[in-house]
Structure formats: structure tokens, C-alpha cells
Amino acid sequence: MASEERITALKEFLAKDPNDSFSSYALALEYNGLGQTEKAIATLRDLVQRDPKYVAAYQQLGQLYAKMNKTREAKRYYRRGIEAAEETNDMHAKREMEEALEEIEDEW
């Protein structure tokens, strides 16, 4: 299935269940894969507002902002993701985001 078809399918899932965090996250990844970074970011930001414990979304936001050299935003989302990871006991994601945050801070 091509990315555009997956996007259509994910939008259909979300029309039926707007609170489906997994489908929102998958939609953001599809947008990013097509180079539609702003749509990916908007989708992820909506997701973390709706589901503040969806750790992977913070990690993805941090990565996207870091690639765009938007260091302040990347740090903010990594820090929020670390907090969410602690709350959900996702120590693997916590470590990954701590390492990413350290890399950003070392660059500055």
C-alpha cells in the first residue's frame, strides 16, 4: 500500500475514532515519510495534547524539531517526553530521549 493510500485509510480510522492515538501517530509518520513535516508536527502536537502519555509522539517531535534546527522546541518535547516516559515507566524511551537531549545540549 502506498503512503497516500495509508494516509487515506488512517484518516478513515480517525474519522471513526478521533481519539485513536496509534492511528494519529501512524498518520504523522506517513506525513513525515512524504516530506510533509509541518503536517507531521501538527498531527503529533494534537496527539500529545489529547494523549499526554503517548511517549513516542514526544520522541518523534523532538527528532523532527532537531532536524529542523529548532533546538528550543526539540529540547522542550524531549523534556516533556522524558517526564511522560517516567510516568509510564518506559525506561527505554526515557534513556533514548535523555541521550538525544544531551546531544543537542552538547552542540550548543
Regions found by a protein language model. Give the residues of each.
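Alpha-helical linker/edge segments of TPR/alpha-solenoid repeat scaffolds
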Residues: 3, 71-76, 100-108
